């Protein structure tokens, strides 16, 4: 009997017949990262957005970065859904997102400089989304510094402390920010408590009420025209048979419940976050797609069982440009981990997966896949919940022959070398999900439908 063994049953989407492969209709779809983030969701969302009416970001903050390349121009989006690059689409920042107003307004300005239209007709911010303040960012940094060797690798953008306030029921939401009298009262109450903590615990001087009030009141005026009740808007859209694309940030292994806790983000980056972070019921979702790299990467602290040896690590990191879109930090890279893939399929109920960056492996003679972990003589086919155990697990590999060909110019799936198709078939079988598309480059055109 395999340790940690779980019977995997086929996951069937009740409304899946709404989809057809000719792309005539795009069902209500959730796109989830199936690893530790940075899987290439931005490009996938950009492609799928063509046939969607609404594109919704439902969790996280500006700690995430989605990269999209359009006509050789690179766009990096941190808060605004990737669908903003398509005309006629309505983009929504849901209630599950935590918003740094300055970061959001800077992102809007940068898009406008590139000729992208952003206004109340194509961008709506949910009134229930929580707001990141300067004290969140400083607290994030101070707590991380105090952890020393046990640090978790936060981006220090204030995401975690903002979600902490949300759970503690003392957070300030967008609906509060845009109402001056309410905002003043809540900010004053929060700063009274926060400044005590900063002074007594961290020997930090604290923050000026007047300074924050002045700065954020200015942001409120700019943001107010974009604010709405997105749950009502989305449910009305569903009633009117509109197609909605839900854009996840980070990845399943960073989910606060199902990730490698405590080396996780502070939100639900698995499929459940789409429902609570957008105000849409699960029965209105037709399809769940997981985006997964042809190898594995991770930025920040925490276990990565399949990390490459030195020379392969540098080769893949440089070819794959594996540096964080938000922080610029180099990502750790490793062989494809089917244990991670199975976990993502299981907890998200994935209908399909999209494999990205297959071309990065073009020059490798041999390619390994982790099929399980060994720990104290037992074989694990599923993720151990205890991160201390996971850190001691040894990957069990099978080796596949590389294709040693440039695949970036392939026009259809059948053009891929036999070895590449065999590799993809093996990934599909090991994780328990069908492959829908494969990405072989950063451009929109470098995407193959199976």
Annotated model-derived regions:
Residues 8-25:
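Short, Lys/Arg-enriched N-terminal segments with co-localized hydrophobic residues
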Residues 25-450:
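Non-transmembrane, aqueous-exposed alpha-helical and coiled segments at domain scale
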């Amino acid at each position: 009997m395999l340790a940690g063994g779980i019977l995997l049953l086929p996951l069937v989407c009740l409304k899946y017949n709404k989809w057809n492969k000719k792309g005539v209709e795009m069902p209500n779809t959730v796109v989830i990262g199936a690893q530790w983030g940075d899987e290439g969701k931005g490009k996938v969302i950009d492609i799928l957005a063509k046939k969607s009416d609404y594109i919704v970001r439902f969790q996280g903050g500006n700690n995430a970065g989605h990269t999209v390349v359009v006509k050789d121009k690179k766009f990096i989006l941190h808060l605004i859904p990737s669908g903003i690059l398509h005309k006629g689409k309505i983009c929504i920042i849901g209630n599950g997102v935590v918003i740094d107003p300055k970061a959001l307004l800077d992102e809007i300005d940068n898009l406008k400089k590139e000729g992208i239209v952003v206004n109340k007709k194509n961008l709506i911010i949910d009134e229930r989304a929580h707001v990141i303040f300067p004290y969140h960012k400083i607290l994030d940094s101070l707590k991380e510094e105090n952890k020393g060797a046990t640090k978790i690798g936060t981006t220090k953008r204030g995401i975690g402390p903002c979600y902490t306030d949300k759970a503690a029921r003392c957070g300030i939401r967008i609906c509060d920010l845009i109402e001056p009298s309410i905002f003043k009262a809540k900010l004053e109450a929060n700063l009274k408590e926060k400044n005590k903590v900063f002074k007594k615990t961290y020997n930090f001087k604290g923050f000026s009420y007047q300074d924050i009030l002045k700065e954020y009141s200015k942001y409120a005026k700019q943001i107010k025209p974009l604010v709405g009740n997105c749950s009502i808007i989305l449910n009305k859209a569903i009633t009117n048979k509109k197609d909605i694309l839900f854009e996840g940030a980070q990845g399943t292994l960073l989910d606060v419940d199902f990730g490698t806790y405590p080396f996780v983000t502070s939100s639900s980056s698995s499929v459940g976050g789409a429902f609570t972070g957008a105000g849409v019921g699960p029965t209105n979702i037709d399809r769940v797609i997981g985006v997964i790299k042809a190898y594995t990467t991770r930025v920040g602290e925490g276990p990565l069982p399949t990390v490459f040896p030195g020379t392969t690590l540098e080769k893949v990191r440089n070819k794959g440009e594996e540096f964080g879109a938000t922080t610029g930090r180099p990502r750790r890279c490793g062989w494809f981990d089917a244990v991670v893939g199975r976990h993502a399929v299981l907890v998200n109920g994935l209908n399909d997966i999209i494999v990205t960056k297959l071309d990065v492996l073009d020059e490798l003679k041999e390619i390994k896949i982790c099929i399980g972990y060994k720990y104290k003589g037992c074989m694990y086919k599923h993720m151990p919940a205890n991160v201390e155990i996971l850190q001691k697990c040894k990957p069990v590999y099978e080796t596949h022959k590389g294709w040693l060909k440039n695949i970036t110019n392939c026009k259809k799936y059948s053009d891929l070398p036999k070895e590449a198709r065999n590799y993809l078939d093996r990934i599909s079988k090991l994780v328990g999900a069908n492959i829908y598309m494969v990405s072989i480059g950063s451009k929109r055109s470098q995407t193959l439908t199976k």
